[in-house]
């Protein structure tokens, strides 16, 4: 047998021992292992988080409220209590998120609620917010088509089906609609919104509901300053004798009606420096029909015609061509006017009553309002209340103006 030389074997053993005792490579503190990258990529984020900036932009607001965002909702709200128009204490653990506006002529409630930018997100159902000449809420709320539209006579069952956490109602509906809703355990807040004083109070209530008290205070200041400016301007002026007549031709029968003493039309006349002649007769709780003989007997200095469902300019032109109306002194002297409005007439207890007051005062006392500019007033109103810019107002609101505008 051939024997192997011991020298090669010895050399192999020495080589193996040297390899096994060599020091391992040690990295300095913080250095990455050789087989790894210096900063491994983070785990893949969900798509929404990949583009997130340290200070994300606020969500885009509907066009109608972009400029009305200085009063953001606080990130968390404590329980709060609201006192409504009936003096009821309504408690909320959190701000309501599914609000329903119901009842007839609800556009007056809706227009007031939408003063608050949060309304578009929080209101989930309402009745028809139009008055025969358009729907303002549909213009300014991009989500209007996604809301449930209730029938004008919707009952508690239809309203409850929307699963509201708050229903806003005019106070006169407390017994007929409010009580059944309360029985179902649905919170109800009642609002009046019938007089300037009630507007001041009820806007504060809406400010509490939408967690925007500063917004309510700012709008109340706007209203109050406008009223004070008009009152100061007409102070000491001779009061013209005024008639405000609501025109209707239901079923082809023409009728003229005067409002109660407590209604907005009467209040506006007095605030604007006029004498409302209809206060001389016995008035009911609603519109009171008067004859042409009574209208003639009043011998008004200025007559204002209201028409909710027909172009008021057409109505006044028709009356001016009527021989019986031509015999009236106000008509002969060119003092028969169609009450101004846009999508809604400005005589009503809607948010636009302040536009009606300014317009009426300028018609009754033009010498006291030489700088009155109806277009400027309209633009300021919609900017202040709804954050609508001039381009929007020029395109969507100005073309709807009606009545006898200076």
Region roles according to the model:
Residues 3-6, 18-111, 214-247, 369-406:
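Bacterial Sec-exported substrate-binding components of ABC uptake systems
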Residues 100-102, 124-127, 150, 166-170, ...:
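Structural recognition of the beta-strand scaffold that forms the well-ordered cores
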Residues 256-286:
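Alpha-helical, coiled-coil/dimerization segments enriched in small aliphatic residues
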Residues 79, 176-254, 278, 287-289, ...:
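Extracytoplasmic substrate-binding proteins
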Residues 90-92, 107-113, 131-137, 250-255, ...:
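Short, solvent-exposed loop/turn elements at domain surfaces
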Residues 87, 145-157, 194, 282-292:
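Short helix-initiation/N-cap motifs at beta->coil->alpha
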Residues 155-163, 184, 289-299:
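Short helices/loops that flank or line small-molecule/ion binding pockets
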Residues 101-160, 166-172, 277:
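A short, structured surface patch at a secondary-structure boundary
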């Amino acid at each position: 047998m051939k024997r192997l030389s011991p020298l090669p074997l010895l050399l192999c053993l020495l080589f193996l021992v040297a390899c096994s005792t060599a020091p391992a490579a040690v990295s300095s503190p913080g250095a990455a292992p050789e087989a790894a990258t210096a900063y491994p990529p983070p785990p893949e984020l969900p798509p929404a988080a990949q583009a997130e900036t340290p200070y994300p932009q606020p969500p885009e607001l509907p066009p109608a409220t972009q400029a009305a965002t200085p009063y953001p909702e606080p990130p968390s709200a404590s329980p709060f209590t609201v006192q409504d128009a009936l003096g009821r204490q309504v408690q909320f653990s959190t701000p309501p998120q599914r609000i329903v506006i119901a009842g007839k002529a609800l556009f007056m409630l809706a227009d007031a609620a939408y003063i608050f930018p949060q309304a578009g997100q929080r209101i989930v159902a309402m009745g028809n917010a139009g008055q025969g000449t358009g729907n303002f809420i549909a213009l300014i709320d991009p989500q209007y088509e996604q809301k449930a539209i209730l029938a004008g006579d919707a009952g508690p069952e239809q309203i409850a089906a929307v699963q509201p956490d708050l229903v806003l109602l005019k106070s006169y509906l407390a017994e007929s609609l409010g009580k059944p809703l309360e029985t179902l355990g649905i919170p109800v807040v009642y609002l009046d919104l019938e007089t300037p004083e009630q507007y001041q109070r009820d806007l504060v209530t809406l400010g509490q509901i939408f967690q925007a008290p500063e917004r309510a205070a700012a709008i109340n200041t706007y209203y109050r300053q406008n009223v004070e400016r008009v009152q100061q301007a007409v102070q000491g002026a001779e009061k013209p004798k005024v008639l405000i007549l609501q025109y209707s031709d239901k079923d082809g029968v023409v009728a003229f009606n005067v409002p109660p003493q407590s209604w907005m039309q009467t209040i506006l006349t007095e605030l604007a420096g006029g004498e409302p002649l209809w206060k001389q007769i016995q008035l009911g709780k609603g519109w009171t029909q008067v004859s042409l003989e009574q209208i003639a007997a009043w011998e008004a200095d200025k007559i204002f015609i209201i028409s909710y469902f027909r172009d008021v300019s057409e109505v006044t032109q028709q009356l001016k061509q009527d021989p019986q109306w031509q015999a009236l002194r106000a008509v002969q002297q060119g003092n028969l006017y169609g009450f101004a409005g846009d999508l809604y007439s400005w005589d009503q207890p809607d948010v636009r009553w302040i536009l009606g007051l300014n317009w009426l005062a300028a018609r009754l006392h033009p010498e006291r309002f030489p700088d009155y500019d109806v277009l400027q007033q309209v633009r300021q109103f919609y900017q202040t209340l709804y954050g609508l810019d001039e381009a929007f107002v020029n395109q969507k609101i100005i073309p709807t103006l009606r009545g006898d505008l200076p």
